[in-house]
Amino acid sequence: MDIKRTVLWVVFSFSLLMLWDNYNRYTGKPSIFFDNPTTQAAKPAAATDDGKTAAAPTADVPTSSAHAANATGVPDSVAPTKSEIVTITTDLIKADIDTVGGEIRHLELLTHHESSDSTKDIVLFDSTPPRTYLGQTGLIGGAYPNHKSLFTVRPGPRSLEAGDQVQLVLEAEQNGVKLVKTYTFKRGEYKIDIKHDVINKTAAAINPSLYLQLVRDGSKLNNESMFYSTFTGPAVYSDSDKFQKVTFESIEKGKIEHVVKAESGWIAMVQHYFVSAFVPPANVPREYFTKKLATNLYAVGAIMPMGAVAPGATQSMDATLYSGPQESKRLEAVAPGFELVKDYGWLTIIAKPIFWLMIQIHQLLGNWGWTIVVLTIVIKLAFFPLSAASYRSMAKMKLVTPKMTEIRTKYKGEPQKMNAAMMELYKKEKINPLGGCMPIVIQIPVFISLYWVLLASVEMRNAPWLWISDLASPDTLFGSYMIGSFHLTIGILPILMAISMFIQTKLNPTPPDPIQAKVMMFMPIAFSLMFFFFPAGLVLYWVVNNILSIAQQWTISKKMGIVN
């Protein structure tokens, strides 16, 4: 029996199945294996890529359990007749704050550009149809100022200029309760400090709660690939329950799949490479919530009681808003556990050391492309003994292939006798039929981890290497073409990938089964077509790894007299 070929056949079949499953998820059809977090994006009334906008929210002011009995929503009639957009510009971000609610309605990352158009900045918060992505704060517990109230703006600078920070102060008063929001933007930071001062001008004590809320449509990202899937949606973190992702689909179904009450943590909206998050003050009780606001419009937030505010008194509560790239050092400085938004899959314990090693290599080389090349060499050297054992086993299998063919011919139709003869041959030639598989299986977790590191690292975006201008995008050396609804890019790396895989199949033992032999010949073509859609950084890793594997396997085969 040829166990290695059986394993490869299973791997190939599973790859095709996963490819089909990703295609289903990309086109909005139900997934075979996973929940589809973007199902709602396909609804006609949703904010989709066809230009249709999400319905306006009808009850988007949150309510905590403490105020449920006397909760008062904000009626549409209180909407102000006039609003003003205030733009704040720093060295890293450009933010538009609306005087209606003092909410952030637009935020650009000035040093990160669209892969498809380098003249356009990455936009996170956005209120331009069909997009809806907002950062909102306000008070509940009474008819107090919230994200629907009209704020006035204090005069002041709107850019850093010569300083290291700029502040924007907004004020709103309702029923004798005044809310003062102070946004502080700092040079070199994606963090925005937000101070909330509640001033009680009434004759009685009040007990307001502060809410922090992120609102986003559930539509797919424009640059989402059908060949690999990354998470887009809300996330909640607490010290007790750690990092919890919440799909738009689960919110649509009314499921609560996260911690509700905690003493610490944060809430976020996560997407590939970027994240926006509100971080409440530490050691303050809070309620987390996720909910559907309208068709294809969802919210995640936190509610914190501010305590009793006596007449004439002022109560304050700070919060931090981070809206920017998933750069590990920046994430670690925001809040405990915040680095977990950088999704390395279920092998984080292996992926994090690999990324740390990448950082060290990059500090020496200064180029992410060469970093990938050197990292691949380092990992290949680390697994050299295991790989050598695997290749020696495959070389032995190739040496006895003629004898195996004779046994199959001799005992055709007699599987028990054939298997017994095969076992006797393995014993005589001192061959372990699993010897070529087990060393490879042991390495699989590391290779999967490296895959996720390269896929999740925002550092790859717009990073050049030789002819490649962006390691996070497909190689486009030979052009880019539209085939129906597919955007096909033709590059040299996927072609080199196919060539290297073809050479590897020639070095491996030829499968005795004609069908398996044809499948093994077809695999390089199938995988190269798939890799035309993958980020160049990932394909670069596979090409370098294949070249090193070919060199090692050829050397071992030559020493054993299999190749000339």
Curated annotation (Swiss-Prot):
Ranges that cross the membrane: 7-24, 293-313, 341-361, 364-384, 438-458, 483-503, 524-544
Annotated segments matching region Disordered: 43-76
A Gene Ontology BP annotation from the UniProt entry: protein transport
Residues forming coiled coils: none
Swiss-Prot/TrEMBL keywords: Cell inner membrane, Cell membrane, Chaperone, Membrane, Protein transport, Transmembrane, Transmembrane helix, Transport
Signal sequence coordinates: none
Record keyword Oxidoreductase present: no
Membrane topology: Multi-pass membrane protein
A Pfam family assignment: 60KD_IMP
Biased composition (Low complexity): 43-60
Keyword check for GTP-binding: no
InterPro entries hit by this protein: Membr_insert_YidC, Membr_insert_YidC_N, YidC/ALB3/OXA1/COX18, YidC/Oxa/ALB_C, YidC_ALB_C, YidC_periplasmic_sf
Subcellular location per the Swiss-Prot or TrEMBL entry: Cell inner membrane
Recorded superkingdom: Bacteria
GO CC entries: plasma membrane
GO MF annotation terms: membrane insertase activity
Function: Required for the insertion and/or proper folding and/or complex formation of integral membrane proteins into the membrane. Involved in integration of membrane proteins that insert both dependently and independently of the Sec translocase complex, as well as at least some lipoproteins. Aids folding of multispanning membrane proteins.
Subunit: Interacts with the Sec translocase complex via SecD. Specifically interacts with transmembrane segments of nascent integral membrane proteins during membrane integration.
Sequence similarity: Belongs to the OXA1/ALB3/YidC family. Type 1 subfamily.
Record protein name field: Membrane protein insertase YidC
Organism the protein comes from: Janthinobacterium sp. (strain Marseille) (Minibacterium massiliensis)
Gene: yidC
